[in-house]
Amino acid sequence: MIVCAAAVLPPATVSAYNILYAEQYYKLYHQNMYQYPQDFRENVWYLERALKRPFVNPLNAMADIDNKLEWRRYRYLFSMHLNLEMVKQYRRWAAEYDKREAYFYNYPWKQANIKSLSIAEQYYQKALYYWDQALTWWARLRDVEYVELKRVQHWEDEYARIRDGDLDYGAIIQEDLNRLLRVRKDFEEMDEDTY
């Protein structure tokens, strides 16, 4: 009976919706980040696409938008926030390859550790690039009159933390890179006598 019904009924069509807007990619990033926080490659993939895509119509924005000023502030805040998320993802990704210390007993894996540090350095450099991008959007925001945007206050908090000097990924990443260079030097100086 079930086989007969399946043969008579037309096949169900499955449709997927197109992902067209920055906010859609951002929501997918958020979902993936909470389910798989260590999947940096996919998290970065979603964020990169969000940075390249247009914004949704103000009616569908992640904040309540009632006028052009709010729309402008929303777009600048969102762009700054996306770049800050890229900084966080690349720093965390770099930490997967970074070695905090060059222990003498790691000499047998000296070359592997040096290679790992090179990968970490590349990710830290990427994080610095996105920090500069975030600062560009932050600077543009200074010229936009403040309006409260409900539902995205944490973006305003990021703006204020940068303004007040409480959030400076440039200095943080520079410390990461300085430590990395010191650790790399320690690994490069290792030989059989230090083991």
Residue ranges and their predicted role:
Residues 1-8:
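Bacterial N-terminal signal peptides
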Residues 10-76, 188-195:
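Immediate post-signal-peptide N-terminus of mature secreted/exported proteins
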Residues 18, 25, 29, 72, ...:
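Surface positions of alpha-helical coiled-coils, especially the charged/polar e/g heptad sites
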Residues 31-35, 50-53, 57, 100, ...:
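Surface-exposed polar/charged interaction patches
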Residues 34-38, 45, 64-71, 95-129, ...:
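Short coil/linker segments at helix-helix boundaries
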Residues 64-81, 139-194:
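TPR/TPR-like alpha-solenoid helical repeat scaffolds
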Residues 78-81, 85-88, 92, 99, ...:
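"A position-specific structural signal for the A-helix of alpha-solenoid helical repeats
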Residues 83-84, 88-93, 123-141, 166-172:
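Amphipathic alpha-helical coiled-coil segments
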